[in-house]
Curated annotation (Swiss-Prot):
Originating species: Pseudomonas putida
Identification of the protein by name: 4-hydroxylaminobenzoate lyase
Entry superkingdom: Bacteria
Catalysed reactions, as listed in the record: 4-hydroxylaminobenzoate + H2O + H(+) = 3,4-dihydroxybenzoate + NH4(+)
Keywords: Lyase
Keyword Cell membrane belongs to the record: no
Family statement drawn from the similarity comment of this UniProt entry: Belongs to the PnbB family.
Length: 176
């Protein structure tokens, strides 16, 4: 079995445990308590995701350059309980916006059915904006209908996420 298949197998095991949960602030807290960076699940999945990015089989499609890449590793199917599995690499170094936080923003989008997002920092101090604030190693869980920029600061990280029915929409304009 190759690493990609091993990763998808681990994700299926994880999804079997969360398939009936709806993304929201309570689930975000629950994920961080039960599947946070000290958990075996987080450690095994994050190690394979980091390997995948380094080896070029995960987050390998450039969006706006090598600092912002994405790839879907698995489409929604019965085996994944109809969740898709996607990896996004974002690096704020050298690409910061001229704002107080010095962040890098990806493409504005919406989550019709929510998102379960494992945050995997590659640089010490790298964090991703989430519904409950800045998140280092751990989880964010934007609720169904949420819209946001994926936003990172303090370096590189991987957002490794699970979308119910694979639903994500880029057909929205940012508010304000």
């Amino acid at each position: 079995m190759n690493k990609r298949d091993e990763l998808i197998g681990l994700c299926i095991d994880f999804l079997a445990k969360v398939k009936d949960k709806t993304a929201n602030a309570n689930i975000e807290r629950w994920l961080n308590e039960n599947y946070g960076p000290d958990s075996e699940t987080y450690q095994k999945i994050s190690t394979l995701v980091i390997d995948g990015v380094a080896e070029g089989w995960a987050a390998n499609d450039e969006i706006s350059g090598p600092h912002y890449r994405r790839s879907r590793l698995c489409e929604p199917c019965a085996e994944t309980f109809y969740f898709s599995i996607t990896a996004v690499y974002m690096d704020s170094k050298g690409h910061e916006l001229d704002n107080q936080q010095r962040t890098f923003r990806g493409d504005y989008h919406s989550h019709p059915y929510g998102e379960l997002n494992m945050v995997i920092p590659l640089d010490e101090g790298a964090v991703l904006a989430g519904p409950l604030g800045w998140q280092g190693a751990g989880w964010t869980a934007p609720a169904p209908g949420s819209q946001h920029y994926p936003e990172v600061k303090n370096g590189a990280l991987i957002a490794f996420f699970f979308l119910p029915a694979g639903r994500i929409s880029y057909d929205f304009q940012a508010q304000g």
